């Protein structure tokens, strides 16, 4: 039964309600970009209708587009443009001062644009709003993803905010209400816009996914692929005017800028810590809940975040997609490659204000600062020993558990820390990465080179507060201090004897094993017994 004048007649929604048809003359007026946009929009509108179960049979227009045929309508001499789906609140809230018929004409005309041809006509098939048909309920949000109605300015009555798209105005109103009516059948996640749900579904189906030829990574969006390719090229077009740091994405630069202005609007209700981004706050909250929803199928280790799991999986697969162009070394994480590159450039942008020492990584500077403050935040519950870094505590705890997960493939020796294994491997390769500029001597460890340099400088920077004795190296000072403290942390499990140095314990253990401490070298001299 028809409604009263000015009301919307309810009826089933069809593809023709959201489609535009061209005559041959009109189609020829469009350039390549406009034609491609038209094809893209028609396909997307059709997919949305199919997803909602509205489109039963495939329209002739879609068949033409799929076959690569020109979609102009031979039977028509002018374009037919039916209005998009609308709902009654648009009449009340968004178009208070305009006739709806005029608004439709302007929206369609500006959305697809005049191509400059004076003979290109546009006719609205419905002469009044009463003739527009909308589905009775459930699809009032469909208009948000129908791009046939762009570039019309609307105003939200709540916030008096101006929008340049019909869809933006409606989605803004939806955000105000906070409703999430579109639910994913696969994982149950809800969205306030159908277009967002459509995008989300591609994650499950991998539909229209884009693969990187460089490393094989699959991405859901072409724009993401373009951004990702910048990682391989090392391209960083977005530069911070404040500190000069460059980024490969504008969004990363925007996040970075908040460091300088120290804007931290997102606060944790649990501990009061504030963050510049909501996403960082969300990640931080997991610390309090202890939630680790992402589990590795290979070793069953669990992680707080999906990105951490992805990085972890590369340990099992041995995948190292990030390669240094300078020396050819491969890395399983892009961040590790970025850190590594600074070795070649010699760049050390992070300087300690206390002693002037410079570092190539901010994390190293933060770690270094704790030497001056004496802060040791990470304490072992087993023996009470405190550490500057959490990684040091993790490695230390393996002393108590006896766990040695890092094994050398060359000789089978196992270690409790990854760094210890890396150092050990250099024994087999005889790799001396770090060379002394003074005498040319090579070392497998940078710390050993640093210690060695003291021989040339004669510098003794480490002084004992107890007796005033000065030492070249902090390790020597630490060992010396145990004399005053009478501390003997290294205990023999065999007889219980304790030592203040691990080297002394190692030497002592050979007494129990019967191993000779010093093995004489083979002597070729012959002696006469007479």
UniProtKB/Swiss-Prot annotation:
Q: Which domain of life is it from?
A: Eukaryota
Where on this chain are zinc fingers (C2H2-type) annotated? 182-204, 210-232, 238-260, 266-288, 294-316, 322-344, 350-372, 378-400, 406-428, 434-456, 462-484, 490-512
The family database entries (InterPro entries) matched by this protein are listed as: KRAB, KRAB_dom_sf, Znf_C2H2_sf, Znf_C2H2_type
The keyword Heme is annotated on this UniProt entry? no
A single Gene Ontology MF term assigned here is: RNA polymerase II cis-regulatory region sequence-specific DNA binding
**UniProt crosslink position (Glycyl lysine isopeptide (Lys-Gly) (interchain with G-Cter in SUMO2)):** 264
Which Gene3D superfamilies would you find in this protein's record?
Answer: 6.10.140.140, Classic Zinc Finger
Family matches, as Pfam families:
KRAB, zf-C2H2, zf-C2H2_6, zf-H2C2_2
**Compartment list:** Nucleus
What this protein is reported to do is described as: May be involved in transcriptional regulation.
> Where does this protein chiefly localize?
nucleus
Record's keyword terms, sorted? DNA-binding, Isopeptide bond, Metal-binding, Nucleus, Repeat, Transcription, Transcription regulation, Ubl conjugation, Zinc, Zinc-finger
A single Gene Ontology biological process assigned to it is: regulation of DNA-templated transcription
Cellular component terms per the entry's GO annotation: nucleus
Where do the KRAB domain residues begin and end?
Answer: 13-84
What name does the UniProt record give this protein? Zinc finger protein 680
Question: What family is this protein classified in?
Answer: Belongs to the krueppel C2H2-type zinc-finger protein family.
Could you confirm whether the keyword Ligase appears in this record? no
Where is the signal peptide, in residue numbers? Answer: none
